[in-house]
Amino acid sequence: MSGFTRPLARLIDQFERLPGIGPRTAQRLALHLLRQPEEQIRSFADALLAARTEVGHCQTCHHLSAEPTCEICRNPERANGQICVVADSRDLLALERTREFSGHYHVLGGLISPMDGIGPDLLQISSLVKRVAANNTEEVILALTPSVEGDTTSLYVARLLKPFTRVSRIAYGLPVGSELEYADDVTLSRALEGRRAVE
C-alpha cells in the first residue's frame, strides 16, 4: 500500500478484511484510531480480545452468548411452544429488532451448500431435531434466506421435523438471493406474520 508506513498499511489491510469495509473506509478507520489516545486504543483492543475469548455459543440454541445459556433461552417470558430457525446470529438479531416474535430460536450456523462443502452434519440440524422431539414444540418457523441454499436447508429441516411438529416458513417480501440481516423491520415483521406451512 503506497504512501503508508508498514504498520499503518498492515492496520488498513486488517480493516479491509472485515465484511463491508472497502479500502477508503479502512483508511478512514485506521487514521481515526491513530488520532485517539493510547488508553482508548488499548480499551478497543481489550474489548476485541475479550469478545473473542469470552463469547461462545448457547448450549440450547447456539446463539452467541457469554454464558452457557443465552438471555433469550433463559427468559421465562418467551413462548416455549415456538422455535424460529435461522442460519446465524445476525438473522436472529434482525428478527429480534422487529419485536414480532416472542418464542425461542435455533441457530443452524449456516446453510446446506454442497458447492462449499457444507452438508447437514456441519450444521446444528441434529441438535434441532433432538430439541424439538424432546420438548412440546407446537411450531417450528423456518426463517432462512430465500436462496438455493436457504430453500435446500428449509426442505431438509422440514422433512426431518414434520413427524414431531408443525413446520412453517416465513413469507418473503424479499428478492431471491437477498440477505435477511439487511431487510428493514417492516418487511421482516410482515414476513413473520405471513408465514405459511411447508408443503
From Swiss-Prot:
InterPro entries registered for this protein in UniProt: DNA_Rcmb_RecR (IPR000093), Rcmb_RecR (IPR023627), Rcmb_RecR_Znf (IPR015967), TOPRIM_dom (IPR006171), TOPRIM_RecR (IPR034137)
Domain Toprim: 81-175
GO biological process, one term: DNA repair
Domain of life: Bacteria
Keywords: DNA damage, DNA recombination, DNA repair, Metal-binding, Zinc, Zinc-finger
Gene Ontology terms, MF aspect: DNA binding; zinc ion binding
ZnF (C4-type) residues: 58-73
Function: May play a role in DNA repair. It seems to be involved in an RecBC-independent recombinational process of DNA repair. It may act with RecF and RecO.
Family: Belongs to the RecR family.
Protein known as: Recombination protein RecR
Taxonomic source organism: Synechococcus sp. (strain WH7803)
Source species taxonomy: Bacteria, Bacillati, Cyanobacteriota, Cyanophyceae, Synechococcales
UniProt gene name: recR
